[in-house]
Amino acid sequence: MLLGLHTYSFHLHGLGGDWGDHRWEGKRAMDIFQLMDEAPVLGLDGLHITAADCESTEKDQLKKIRTAAEKHGLYLEYNFSLDEKYDRRLTKTFEEGIAIAEALGADVAKVSLDLKRPRPLAASRHHPDVMRQLEDIARKLNVAAPMAKAAGVKLALENHTESFSSEVLWLIDRVNHPFVGACVDTVNAWLVTEDPMVAIENLAPRAFTNHFKDHRIEIESYGCRLTGVALGDGDIDLKRAYQIIREKSSMKRINIEVELDAGTDGPVEARRREREAVERSIRYCREVLHI
């Protein structure tokens, strides 16, 4: 099993996308080439990257990134969204995403569906409003899937922050193409009130890739807070999650994702904590899970 890192794990350093802290202006603290230089030292085998990391998706820039990854012996996976509201750089059509992934030498392109859900969330699984969106995505996938096959790029549909695992499976079954599968995120099911362990069980057999992450539920006076932590510090049963992936999927890579909150810290301290969380997550995978 190879071990990689989703670049969003360094979002406070300026990588992955702008879901992070918008208060900090100026030059990013790390770019994709610096991370690739450091990846072998960190003990990583690959990176799961976005258009925000590439800075430009022009052919020359993508070739430069691909060459640097090959120099370091790193696999690359590409991550894009159909309608990313927080960072429009990540929004691509299926055709654009496939072309970028192919240029990078990535064999997997992860796709966020970005569904618009009615509330209450717990009552919205396969809601008619959601199904209309899924039908539209299925039509686009039917056109894109042969292109993905020709490019050698598998499309991995994620149970992102707005998708039930059964909806992802419905879409995969609807398209019924060997180059259309899942990306299983070990946390995201919580955000639509689904049991994360059930979602992992459901999606792992159909998954091409993963976001292997951990969150902790913190009870507070007004309710609760779900917050990203280093792997092993949260409430996801990661040992069981890894067992499911090993036993029930064909995946040969684990992609760590850390979603650390800057809190009230300034950029220097927040980035120090983020790096520490990434390093601890890598150690957890190596020393506890024996990846």
Each language-model region and where it sits:
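H/E-rich (His + Asp/Glu) clusters that bind or coordinate divalent metals
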Residues: 234, 239-241, 248, 252-267
